[in-house]
Amino acid sequence: MPVHEIRHPLIRHKLGIMRRADLSTKSFRELSQEVAALLTYEATKDMPLAPASVEGWCGTVEVDKIAGKKVTVVPILRAGIGMLDGVLSLIPGAKVSVVGVARNEETLQAHTYLERLVGELDQRLALIVDPMLATGGSMVAAIDMLKRAGCREIRALTLVSAPEGIDAVLTAHPDVQIYTASIDQGLNENGYIMPGLGDAGDRIFGTTQKHAE
């Protein structure tokens, strides 16, 4: 299945706290990173391993090491930055690519305004991070950009997803795996996820929310 709703008890508990409207910026930011780390654990379970040897305290020890493609983490600005450290806490050697995608609040259409991608993308697994998968426009635009640059293995990590956004991504890119902490009810008339988390970018950075979900 290309869509994975991770219903681990720790994720369910932390996400429940994040839904509180009165949660502090500090707590929301920390929980975003914690849930991102748990999603990363799930999204990398099938990474290939190769045997290796190390010198232990009692002599040579046979161990496993991660093999295969290197990883690039791709936060979609700006809200994706809030998940970045959570992913890097588990994969500290990963390179970071940055994609800027903005959504027109009237048309709900996404457009890219920034592209800072690492090299050798054809040899990397890309983990795109964005807290909210709403209409799917931003995610599709980011995937389009990565594929144009040569990346062929892409996974998306989101805190909350709407069915409409999932459908949009899989229609455009059926080869992409989606890992999300929750599939919510759907979008309201303004294109916001219900019940959602509110504006994740505003809640992570402490700026004023223009709309509430």
Swiss-Prot record:
Organism (species): Bordetella parapertussis (strain 12822 / ATCC BAA-587 / NCTC 13253)
Superkingdom of the source species: Bacteria
Name of this protein: Uracil phosphoribosyltransferase
NCBIfam families: PRK00129.1, upp
Enzymatic class: transferase
InterPro entries named among the record's database cross-references: PRibTrfase_dom, PRTase-like, Upp_B, UPRTase/APRTase, Ura_phspho_trans
SUPFAM superfamilies from the UniProt entry: PRTase-like
Protein role: Catalyzes the conversion of uracil and 5-phospho-alpha-D-ribose 1-diphosphate (PRPP) to UMP and diphosphate.
HAMAP family tied to this protein: Upp_B (MF_01218_B)
Any one GO biological process: UMP salvage
Gene name of the record: upp
